[in-house]
C-alpha cells in the first residue's frame, strides 16, 4: 500500500495513540490533519512501520507525556520534521528513535526538562550528527543504552546534567563517534555502569573525574575497548561494586592499569575481569583488593600474555567455585604466588593453568580439590614445568581428565599417587606429549568407568616404564593412538586388558620402536572397526599372536604390520578379512618374516593391495592360491624386493579390474610364480625377465623361461 487516508478520522478526544500506526505497511503517511490536542501517549506510535515519507508538522504534542519507542525500528524513514513538536511535558523518551534509519533530524526544538527516561533513545541509529546542546537532562534517572552502537560521527553531550542519573549501563556501548567529551558527566548517583563503554572505538577515555562511590555494577564496563591505550581508574571508589566480571576484558592495547585503590570487599564476580589484556605487563594487587566474597574467578587473567609475575598472596578464595581458565594463555608468566589459595569450594579447574608456557614452578600442594568436578586441560601446554606434585589432590568427583597434562613436554616428575579416578570417563590426551617423562606409575588408577583412552600416552617419547597392568578397560570404546610415538617403551603389560567394547585401535602401537614384547592374546572385540597402522614401525617386536582377534568388522588393514623389522612370528590363523577393502602396505618391510600363513584370508572385497608384501626380504614362500582379486584395482610393488621369495602361487588371481600394477615383482630375483595366463594377462608385460613363470590352465602347468 502506497498511502493511507486519515481525513475522515475524528480524534479530537483521543488521549492514547500508542501503537496507532505500528507495523503498518505503507510508504507515505500524511498526518497534517490529525488532531492530537488531547493525546498524552504516543509510545510505539510508528514502531516498526514501513513508512518512507511522514508528515507530522501539525502535531500538537503539548500534553504528551510518553514518546517512548515512537519511531523505533522505522527502517525506511530517513527524515522527519518535528520542528513543531512541543515536548515540555514528556517524561518518557525511552528508545524514541532506536534502530531507525533517520539521518537528519532537528533536535534543538525538543524540550526535555521533565524527561526522566532516555534509555536507548538513539541506540542503533546512524544520525550524521547529534547536537544535543539544548537537551536539559537534569531530571533524567536512566540513560542506559542511550547511544548504544550509535554510528553518528559527531555527538555533543557537553551540556548534559547527569546528577540524577542512576543507570548508565550500555550508554556508549559500541559507539563509533569522533572526540567524545565526557567531562560534563556527573556520576555521583549512578549505580549501574555495566557495559558502559563496551566495544568503544576510542583510544583515550577520560574518566578520571568519575565519582563511583554508589556504583554496584561495573561488569563489561570497558570490555572490547581494543583501541584504548590509557585508562585512569586511580580515583575509582569501588566499595559498593558487586560485579566486576569482564570489566577490562579485551583491552588489548592497555599497557598500564592502576587498581591500587580498588576496594573490592563486596565483589562477588570477577570472571574474565582482565581477560585478553595482552599488553598489560604489571598488576599490583594491594590489601584493599579484597576477594573474600568472590565466587567466580573463571578466566580472570586469561590471555594476559605479557604478564611475567603475579603476586596473589593477598587473595582470599575460600568462596570461589569456578577457577576454570583463570591463568589460561598467560604465555610469559614465570611466577605466580597462589600459595595461600583456599580451593575448598572450587568445582571447576578446567584449563586453570593451560598454555602457561613459561611457568617453571607451581606450588599447589595445599590445594583442596575434594569438590572439583572438572580438571580437563588443567596443565596443558605448560612447556617449561619440570616437576608437579599432585599427591594431595582429591579427584573423587572428576569425570573428565582429558588433556590434563597435554604438551607438558619438560615435565620429568609427576606424582599422582593418591589420584582417585573412580568416576573418570574421559582420559583422552591425558599425558600426550609429556616428552620428558621417563617413568609413570598408574597402578593406583581405577579406570572402570573410562570410555575413551585415545591418545592417552601419545608422544611420551622418553617413557621407558609405564605401569598400567591394573587398568580395567571393560568400558573403553576408543583406544586409537593410545601409545603412538612412545619411542623408548620396550615393554607393555596388557594381558588384563578387556577390549570387548573397543571400536577403534587405529595407530595404537604405531612408532613404539623399542617395544619387544606384547601379549595381546586376550584381545577380543566383535565390534572393532578400525585397526589400520596398529603395529606400524614397531621395529623391535619379535612375535605377535592375533589368533583371538575378531576382525569381522574391519574394512581397513593398511600399514598394520609395516616396518615390523624384527617380527619373526605372526599368528593370523583366525583373522577374518571378509569386509576388508584395503590391505596396502600391510606387511611392508617385515624383513624378518620367513613365512606367512594367510589361509584364513578372504579377499573378495579388497580393492588395494599395493606394497602389501614389499620388502619382506626373508620371506621364502607365500601361498596366496585362495586369494580372490577380482575387485583389486592396485597391486603396485606388491611383492617388490622380496629377494628370497622362491615360490609364489597366485593362480587364483584375476587382475581384470586392476588399474595399477607397476613393479609388481621388482627385484624378486629367485622367484617362480604360478599364475593363470587368461586371468592375469594384464600384468604379463610387467613381469621382469628374471622371474620364472609357470602357467596353470585346468590344473595343467607349463613353464616359460
Regions found by a protein language model. Give the residues of each.
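Negatively charged
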Residues: 1-705
